[in-house]
């Protein structure tokens, strides 16, 4: 006995199959509005959400993957700070289930930033519940990681609670 289209995910809480929709900037825009977040268009396929300690980029350019990538505001300007960032990236990637962390060299080749990223496979689209859950979990994981960074690497923090440089 069939309960419906078995190719769609079944939501046991609602007792029905839920539809999947392609992920695009319009859907991300609706999620961000729903959470009262300020954001701008970074490109046709990417929205940027500035916060006090990072800029979060919601990227829909790959039709198979939805990516949330956040650039932390802390910057390594010397060898000791670079080594500290390397250690924090290593620690994040070896002890946390997410986000994935990596270093990002600046164009001058002498300074480095840190990026944290969460991805979800979206080849068949995502339901509203899946998109909301990805928003909640990925934002929480990245924000928690950045909060820990600010505690561990307090000398990197050059901004105040409002996000202005001190």
Predicted ranges, named:
Residues 1-62:
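Charge-rich, low-complexity N-terminal segments
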Residues 45-50, 68, 114-116:
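Generic recognition of long tandem-repeat/solenoid scaffolds
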Residues 57-76:
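A short acidic-to-branched-hydrophobic micro-motif
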Residues 62-64, 138-141:
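A short, surface-exposed beta-strand/turn
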Residues 72-117:
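Short, internal acidic amphipathic alpha-helical interface segments
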Residues 90-93, 139-146, 150-153:
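Short amphipathic alpha-helical signal-transduction/dimerization elements
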Residues 122-137:
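A short acidic/glycine-rich loop-to-helix N-cap element
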Residues 150-166:
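Short, highly charged C-terminal tails/helix-capping segments
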């Amino acid at each position: 006995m069939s309960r419906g289209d078995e190719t769609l995910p079944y939501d046991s809480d609602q007792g029905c199959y839920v539809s999947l929709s392609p992920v695009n900037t319009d859907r991300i825009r609706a999620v961000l509005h729903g959470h009262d977040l300020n954001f701008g268009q970074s490109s046709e396929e990417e929205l940027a959400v500035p916060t006090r300690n990072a800029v979060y980029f919601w990227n829909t350019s790959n039709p198979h993957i939805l990516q949330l990538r956040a650039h932390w505001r802390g910057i390594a300007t010397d060898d000791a700070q670079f080594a500290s960032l390397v250690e924090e990236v290593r620690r994040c990637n070896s002890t946390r289930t997410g986000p994935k962390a990596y270093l990002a060299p600046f164009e001058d080749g002498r300074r480095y930033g840190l990026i944290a990223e969460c991805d979800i496979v979206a080849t068949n689209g995502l339901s509203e519940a899946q998109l909301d859950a990805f928003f909640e979990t990925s934002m929480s994981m990245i924000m928690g990681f950045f909060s820990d960074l600010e505690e561990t690497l307090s000398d990197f923090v050059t901004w105040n609670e409002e996000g202005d440089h001190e």
